[in-house]
Amino acid sequence: MALEQAMQAARRGDLDVLRSLHAAGLLGPSLRDPLDALPVHHAARSGKLHCLRYLVEEVALPAVSRARNGATPAHDAAATGYLSCLQWLLTQGGCRVQEKDNSGATVLHLAARFGHPDVVNWLLYQGGANSAITTDTGALPIHYAAAKGDLPSMKLLVGHYPEGVNAQTNNGATPLYLACQEGHLEVTKYLVQECSADPHLRAQDGMTPLHAAAQMGHNPVLVWLVSFADVSFEQDHDGATAMHFAASRGHTKVLSWLLLHGAEISQDLWGGTPLHDAAENGELECCQILAVNGAGLDVRDHDGYTAADLADFNGHTHCSRYLRTVQTLSLEHRVLSRDPSMDLEAKQPDSGMSSPNTTMSVQPPNFDLGSPTSTLSNYDSCSSSHSSSKGQRSTRGARSSDLQSYMDMLNPEPRSKQGKPSSLPPPPPPSFPPPPPPGTQLPPPPPGYPAPNPPVGLHLDNIYMQTKNKLRHVEVDSLKKEPSSGDGYSGLRRQDSGLLRQDSELLLRHNTGLRRQDSDRKQRSFSKQPSTGDYYRQLGRSPGEPLAARPGMAHSEEAALLPGNHVHNGCSADSKASRELPPPPPPPPLPEALSSPPPAPPLPIEGAGAACGQRRSSSSTGSTKSFNMMSPTGDNSELLAEIKAGKSLKPTPQSKGLTTVFSGSGQPASQPESPQPAVSPGPSRARSPTPPASGPQPLLNGSIVPAPPATLAPGVHLDVEALIPTLDEQGRPIPEWKRQVMVRKLQQKMQEEEEQRRKEEEEEARLASLPAWRRDILRKKLEEEREQKRKEEERQKLEEIQRAKEQSEKLRTLGYDEAKLAPWQRQVILKKGEIPK
């Protein structure tokens, strides 16, 4: 009880409670929360300088005490951006500016990581901070500023330490690489144009900033690099090009731009083309774009698989059926004209961050059989001039039935739902032997028991879908299982970014499909381990908000600048050498109350990547993590979609008035410290025009009109006339005609509010049935329309006010007293300039 009271009082700035606890002898160095933080830490991270000084000077709590991750109160103050507390701790509290936590991060690293340029400025020019100090991962503060996209901090750090512009971390990441990977165009321009950053520097696996931008789908950054930075479409150490990265992640806009600007469809060192990557990951639209641009549908990789084979083995039957069907068509027949009426539904713009298939592995094709449309985007009915059509079968005499079967392929769902037999023959079986069964099979049942009945009528497609769904399902209990410290971090090269991971507390979710058992490519398993970054992520969280949604700690502030073993495309370069390295120190466990945060409806945002095998693993991932990294393989698409939908994770002036209070069990509670309203992290619904009961009541013809209820229960009839008062403010009875006018106006207002509420509910229900990526895009579009409508209404209101002022001025100029004029007289005067006799 004393622990919870002390922590809450330190965060709220309640000095009286702290004094009473101290008088009772309950405040001491042993009073620590589950992460070993003292009340001094909580006061520093909340900006309560008076409580901080009281705890240090009068209670004699140590100001240099460290939490479990090695963080001092100065680290907490720097991470949350409270400069006054940081200044006092460094000048009078005994903390030192160069002190590191367990990951090697100083207060300057944390200020740059969480985007506090005022703190960075003071530390550099008055606090004596050294911007050349690296963390255990080899990261400078400038790396964190680049990953955060904090241009003011970036300029300060470059001016203080220009040599850091091209500095590389232990895995070869430069600030430019991290800025491109996170899509920070302004930081990218600044580094290249003003700081002369080298865009050709490669990470240890050969990836360039161009590859990083293509992998994460940042089309503006990629376009700028190609246009102004003199970079070419080169390959990394595995032979992968930017097109491979874009195709594997479903970034159709990036893929289209690369094809239209001279990028070639080439093979990597495994013999795989971008079509192989797109098919293996179930990216149907990318398969279509590549198919109409001359990608070889019958090209086999070094394992002997075509793109359709890979789609089959990973359960992406919609891709495999499409690819096998278009093999019989000529290149001209593959291209469909684009229907402008489908722009909103079928031609959704690429989010620039993630593929739709990161949240659902089977993407429902958006095609209408009656009006065949393709999301092949930017192409007309002729193939691109630069595309290679090598290896394609030319069947110009294709029958119309072939084209119709191709159209059926684009949308197989309606036929199956209607129960009509499919006219399309089943796809031919693979030409290679099926994978051998696993060696550990159950023994046959005893002879006395009848053999189990085989499944009846289970189609091959359903088998794949059921297997895939089972592989994707993760029980909540598995999230609490902590892997051993020897587990290596391996990432999907074209499924997840390698050098930088987002600061999302979303547990990992990966598309898990059937693997080719006879392939020589190793499977990768992914696990989430707590790190010292968990401590910093808890500094300002409210109970109802997701973990990375605290103002001031944006999703992109995390950089997986991993040290230790050099990992080449996800595989350790030398397993023996990796075994010789000492294991990392055990990370602090998360509080039990925070180990499984509640999922945000309608999509679950929690999962665990228990076993995800992909053809290519991510670059530059190691077996240890820095303090602020959850896992280098975390997928941040859902979080980024929420950000695009309006869930801003950046600090806002309205959100500065919140102090987050942590209880002893690690469960925080939000406490307002100023009259400013708190900004909800989620997209709020349109507010009802009904004023709050605590505010001033509206006046209608000089009488108070009660506010109608926000919602009524179904079947409840509200007597509106009973809500209208019979007496005015002076106690005089209101005439009946006036009350009837007030009743009609109140009824109209209630009807408008009910109609608005009904529209909002219908809109939410319609959006809930859509995939997450499309739902967020449509929600953003609707919000933009509402904003435009609001601005238009404000403009009209201002025009009416201006018109009324001009009319009043005209009446005064003519010598009339506006208060003594009847409305009809006022209108006549304004129209003719005089009162009729």
UniProtKB/Swiss-Prot annotation:
Q: How does it assemble?
A: Monomer. Interacts with PFN2. Binds F-actin in a Ca(2+)-resistant fashion. Interacts (via N-terminal) with BAIAP2 (via SH3-domain). Interacts with MYO3A (via C-terminus). Interacts with MYO3B (via C-terminus).
Basic and acidic residues compositional bias: what residue ranges? 339-348
What species is given as this protein's source? Rattus norvegicus (Rat)
Q: Which SUPFAM superfamilies match?
A: Ankyrin repeat
Name under which the protein is recorded: Espin
An example GO biological process term is: locomotory behavior
Instruction: Outline what the protein does.
Output: Multifunctional actin-bundling protein. Plays a major role in regulating the organization, dimension, dynamics and signaling capacities of the actin filament-rich microvilli in the mechanosensory and chemosensory cells. Required for the assembly and stabilization of the stereociliary parallel actin bundles. Plays a crucial role in the formation and maintenance of inner ear hair cell stereocilia. Involved in the elongation of actin in stereocilia. In extrastriolar hair cells, required for targeting MYO3B to stereocilia tips, and for regulation of stereocilia diameter and staircase formation.
Q: Which residues carry this modification: Phosphoserine?
A: S337, S341, S400, S401, S497, S504, S531, S631, S670, S674, S680
Q: Where is the composition biased (Pro residues)?
A: 423-455, 581-604
